[in-house]
UniProtKB/Swiss-Prot annotation:
It comes from Olivierus martensii (Manchurian scorpion). Keywords: Antibiotic, Antimicrobial, Calcium-activated potassium channel impairing toxin, Defensin, Disulfide bond, Immunity, Innate immunity, Ion channel impairing toxin, Neurotoxin, Potassium channel impairing toxin, Secreted, Signal, Toxin, Voltage-gated potassium channel impairing toxin. It is found in: Secreted. This is Defensin BmKDfsin4. The keyword Methyltransferase does not apply. Has the structural arrangement of an alpha-helix connected to a beta-sheet by disulfide bonds (CSalpha/beta). Dual-function peptide with antimicrobial and potassium channel-blocking activities. Shows inhibitory activity against Gram-positive bacteria such as S.aureus, B.subtilis, and M.luteus as well as methicillin-resistant S.aureus (MIC=0.1-20 uM). Does not act on bacteria by disrupting membranes. Also moderately inhibits Kv1.1/KCNA1 (25.2% inhibition at 1 uM), Kv1.2/KCNA2 (30.5% inhibition at 1 uM), and Kv1.3/KCNA3 potassium channels (IC(50)=510.2 nM, 61% inhibition at 1 uM). Inhibits potassium channels by interacting with the pore region. Does not show hemolytic activity. GO terms for molecular function: potassium channel regulator activity; toxin activity. The keyword Transmembrane does not apply. GO terms for cellular component: extracellular region.
């Protein structure tokens, strides 16, 4: 049971570290393509608008 909990916590931490959050908008909420292009410009795979009223640009890694 302890190993399952430990693996779950490690997976949760790993998934959290895989996302880079950009707070300044970068086109969100009206231009998700601009957010995606911004994320690619900082060597991420892409991005999308997220958060309250889609005002935050979230980048995902390669």
């Amino acid at each position: 049971m302890k190993t399952i909990v430990l693996l779950f916590v490690l997976a949760l931490v790993f998934c959290t570290l895989e996302m880079g959050i950009v707070e300044a908008g970068f086109g969100c909420p009206f231009n998700q393509g601009q957010c995606h292009k911004h994320c690619q410009s900082i060597r991420r795979r892409g991005g999308y608008c997220d958060g309250f009223l889609k005002q935050r640009c979230v980048c995902y890694r390669k």
